[in-house]
């Protein structure tokens, strides 16, 4: 459906002062207009103070039948006729043509120019002859690269634009015939070419192809590298049979067809590629891929002539996005290939396709009367009929936004859909329109007011018009010459037209119709399209468009906030893109006097709810906070506890909050969540009795569940900083176990991150970044006990071990009483391992003044004994603990043992704490390591006994225990072999007798 509005997209107009009656008109990029009449071409300025003044004029070698300008390369190409022969020529360096007497150089395409003549080309126009084996019918210049594609009866010829470098300061433009595309079963009437995409149009058919290229050193290419299949060739056999019928009063019409992708090969159109470029060509087109085939059938039910149903205005429109996004948060990758759109039209309907990842029909335009020509721009579709100039909106900017921006259609960004109905902004009366072209902010219109033709006698509608009659009538020449004019029409500036569209939408605002939303969406897309290529805008113009863009987002947010439809959620992203604060949005709401009975729509409620969930760093006033509470009390009572927990609502009157909370008992809200919210409000009021009663009304597990439902009751963020609530501060003093369990529940349910929890406890306990409070250590221990899946176990080990070591080395006591003792942790968590008995022998040998030191040491020892710990990774953390202390000695001994460095550990124990050696050996020297009893321990003890000293009696006792163990484990011969040779026989005799009796008993 096409909506019709009466806006003013067209501004002032001027007459272009042409000397001769225009036959062909084309636009010369951003600063020139070309008008051809016979063998003359005039160029007019179209920008600045010299608007519509002639810049230059030059003669062509023949009568111009078609012409086009390429901004890439700055050349004009024309199909000319002379002596009934068709020529193709390109006019280069035309800006140097100052007068009719200026010299002109004529050269052949692809030929190298002698160096002696090169310097003369710098200041004179050149004409490049492009000889063709067949007469050219049409052509198209690539708007991106400047390559030229020429259409003939059965083929398309591609001329690649190149520059012949003469020296460092000078190069001349040239072309190279690089590719021939052979096409059967379709005769091109119009073609369009853009960066490898080829569109071919006949009277009733459109074919869209993509030429795919590879580097020259890639795949080898034959003379005909690809030929598409032609499954309908069998249909050619019947062509001769139908020719007899067609010569009479019968017309054979094929049925309409639309084929996309691989199905296009069913069209019966054969395509072959023939490479004609040089071997050193940088890119060669090796393959062709079919994208779209569309065939139309004439409507013979109305008995109209076939000329009235021909296709026209084929166009491939690239839309470049220069890296500037009006949304300011462009995180999407840029594509080198511009976004491409394909347009073609029948007399009464136009079709616009999007060609990106796939081909998709975007919009269908139904014209109120027969069209003659149309031109597509990034913002509008301009259509001319014999009596009017029509302006339609397009969805190109919407398609680009949805395709390129990964964050589109989320809570961050939104854009009107591509499928939205198009509209006609204006149908401007213009008599005798014949041709139209467009560039920048101008439209060129050619009008010819023909004299009224003598009315002919109408044929009976019952008689089918034959092809013969049609051809005779179409060839009848005009009797009289027509009056003509060439107009330059200025289009209205985007911001001015945007403001008019917004004003227009206000007429629908009160009745809340879809027309208001539709027109505001059109205004938004208009500004978005103008901002697409920001590099072409002046800074002031860009700033004005940006302001209009944000304003349009605000209008769309207002519109969606008043809706109850499924699209009401779009109020959120549009308000975000508008840059409006929550308070500014609330100020735009139309509050009624009877606020208790006011109905609030889903869009507004959705926006406020999501905004309060985010960290807006915005405090609402007492009045606005009360309004928000009232809105949710009326519209979404289940969300009221969450809303009241937002930091943006901190200024709300506590009595007002309690008033609404007490009404939630019958609304299906979680009772524990309501209880916690009431407790937080009571604490804010200073009503401690009410606070305690609320906290006692549920078990601790239910309270933890309530905090999981709404984390902001404990933890809030303000300007990027973690802020504990008053409730969290009170729980730290009164119920630290509940606080730790609640934060652990938040982390387990992904409501808070690891870094945030650490910051929370540090801020809560008033510690700086380097200091670690005991409550945070309690939380880390709880994490280890809970075995959370999202916690890296190794990092948690490092945190705890480093804190235990720091407190032991500095002899620091915890700032609060730990929630769990070492025994509690060992019994509750497998990550805290059982400490070996020999470690207790070490510990009891030292008199620690404070039990807390013992508890920290036991926790550290238990972690080192953990089966989950990689001991080698924690050795650097133990460096602050000296082996001169029992804490250092025991931890280092444990590490050496876990690393199976038993001999080193035995040396250390014999030196520092011999009392623990036998207990250590009994526990650790087993199985494969039992040999160390006589290989390491026995020799060491013997040596120390010989040396004497203060501990000689202790060493002697240890030696006896060692001999007893060895005598039990070895047979007599082995036992004799391990005894020292210089030992006293009387000392070792009892053990030898025991060993021999053991053998006789066995």
Swiss-Prot record:
GO cellular component terms, alphabetically, are: BLOC-2 complex; cytoplasm; cytosol; early endosome
Tissue specificity statement from the Swiss-Prot or TrEMBL entry: Found in heart, brain, spleen, liver, lung, kidney and testis.
Subunit and partners? Component of the biogenesis of lysosome-related organelles complex-2 (or BLOC2) composed of HPS3, HPS5 and HPS6. Interacts with HPS5 and HPS6.
Which InterPro entries does the record cross-reference, listed alphabetically? HPS3, HPS3_C, HPS3_N
Q: What does this protein do?
A: Involved in early stages of melanosome biogenesis and maturation.
Which GO BP terms sit in this record?
intracellular transport; melanosome assembly; pigmentation; platelet dense granule organization
Task: Provide the residue span(s) of the region labelled Disordered.
Answer: 218-239
Compartment(s)? Cytoplasm; Cytoplasm, Cytosol
Annotated disorder: Defects in Hps3 are the cause of the cocoa (coa) mutant, which is characterized by hypopigmentation and platelet dysfunction.
Q: Which UniProt keywords apply?
A: Albinism, Cytoplasm
Protein known as: BLOC-2 complex member HPS3
